[in-house]
Amino acid sequence: MTQPLMTMRGIVKTFSGVKALDGIDLTIAPGECVGLCGENGAGKSTLMKVLSGVYPWGTWDGEIIWEGAPLKAASVRDTERAGIIIIHQELMLVPELSVAENIFLGNEITLPGGRMNYAAMYQRADELLRELGISGINAAQPVMNYGGGHQQLIEIAKALNKRAKLLILDEPSSSLTASEISILLDIVRDLKRRGVACVYISHKLDEVAAVCDTISVIRDGRHVATEPMRALTTDRIISLMVGREIKNLFPREPHPIGDVIFEARHVTCFDVTNPRRKRVNDVSFALRRGEILGVAGLVGAGRTELMQAIFGAYPGVSEATVVMEGKPLKIRAPVDAIRAGIGMVPEDRKRHGIVPGLSVGHNITLAVLGRFASAGRIDSAAELDTIHTEMKRLSVRAAHPMLSIASLSGGNQQKAVLTRMLLTNPKVLILDEPTRGVDVGAKYEIYKLIFQLAQRGMSIVMVSSELPEVLGISDRVLVIGEGELRGDFVNDGLTQEDILSAAIRPVQRSPNPTVASAA
């Protein structure tokens, strides 16, 4: 039997008297890929921060055995020297530096006298990229010239340059296209063949199944199960993660669909850096009361820019006529949209959704503070009462509402941003990638909420890159391709192939869809 490369035993980590990890065990062998699964807030990232030295030895209880000896790392530097490398969900690259400079950051090759040996670094960086089978990256170019997919691969090259024996990948595909994900999974398989162990953290269970040998599930800070991947089904993994059986991930509920309530006409957006280039070109669509409208398309198609323009949040020049209940609106900024009954939960919650310096509660009430103001003062008791009520209603899990929102899991941050928008009582709610980076349990709760809102007569626009999600939730689907409307389909027998075909080619399957009700 192969000797373990790393063993964690009885790991306990406490924050303010609350156990975030409660006696967790984890073992991994050379060349093995372990999928670490669990809901947001289950303790996955905390466990990996213990392993990678972010939380140094002495700040947690238990033991880590590395290559047969106790590991007592005082810092990330110590674990990296040992060969344990973590690639975080938020990449740690310096955009202005070259690819090679990023790969060698902190481990630079120098000439006598201490000057940088750029020629040697460029050569070695090119070798690393070739070893990984990565093409299309020039080691001398700044990292900011490359998209998220290439940057993820640069991070892996950086890890290999540090002679990684154990590579921890935390949600590595959250911002990648389908083709980039395929390249990533091939690289993980190649690393396994070389004897590099991997811990793969992802909510995308198809990826976990594709590359992982073993699945380890944690729930509420406790180890639930470790089983071979071949013995598990997706439904079984979900059940272990959430502690209950979810038979239908998309809990469709009948909801009546009324007359047209909202129209966006001739929406056009110009590129921020190149004002001659159109990111969105003359897109028009209508939305009915109680309707769930999915918006699909390839990455970079202009879906987010379309929604930002409607909401008054597009950073560049945009043109649009927005009509609510037959009345044209003047939307110059998001505050105008909110006052008119339009709410939006943005794609990038960390940059445009949450305010990291504020508490969970203050993030929730940020858009409606005027409700609690009297004579220039805030009625804190009334505000706190609303916060408690709304957090309970949407199952926003936090030890206390006055904790920093930055301390919450991604799923709970998303629900807090959603709660804030719902407090504005929108008639139309735009959700841009509402389940990105959240676990299966949180996704299910968000889907249930979407159907509940539709039942109450709210109209929903949901942008998503996950086609099963679009098909499972939507009454109607818009397809955007290269900034243009490529299709407007009733979701009745619609397939992923139909959507992709429309995204690639301007094919109109149902030019004038009408929907009376959804079941």
UniProtKB/Swiss-Prot annotation:
Entry GO MF terms: ABC-type D-xylose transporter activity; ATP binding; ATP hydrolysis activity
SUPFAM superfamilies: P-loop containing nucleoside triphosphate hydrolases
Catalytic activity, as annotated: D-xylose(out) + ATP + H2O = D-xylose(in) + ADP + phosphate + H(+)
Gene Ontology cellular component annotations, sorted alphabetically: plasma membrane
Cited function: Part of the ABC transporter complex XylFGH involved in xylose import. Responsible for energy coupling to the transport system.
Gene name as annotated: xylG
Protein family per UniProt: Belongs to the ABC transporter superfamily. Xylose importer (TC 3.A.1.2.4) family.
The name this protein goes by in its record: Xylose import ATP-binding protein XylG
SMART domains (alphabetical): AAA
Membrane topology according to the record: Peripheral membrane protein
Keyword Transmembrane among UniProt keywords: no
Disulfide bonds: none
InterPro entries associated with the record: AAA+_ATPase, ABC_carbohydrate_import_ATPase, ABC_transporter-like_ATP-bd, ABC_transptr_XylG, P-loop_NTPase
A Pfam family matched in the record: ABC_tran
Subcellular location: Cell inner membrane
Subunit structure: The complex is composed of two ATP-binding proteins (XylG), two transmembrane proteins (XylH) and a solute-binding protein (XylF).
Span of domain ABC transporter: 6-245, 262-507
Keywords: ATP-binding, Cell inner membrane, Cell membrane, Membrane, Nucleotide-binding, Repeat, Sugar transport, Translocase, Transport
Alphabetized NCBIfam families for the sequence: PRK13549.1, xylG
Residues reported in the UniProt entry to bind ATP: G38, E39, N40, G41, A42, G43, K44, S45
Domain of life where this protein originates: Bacteria
EC number: 7.5.2.10
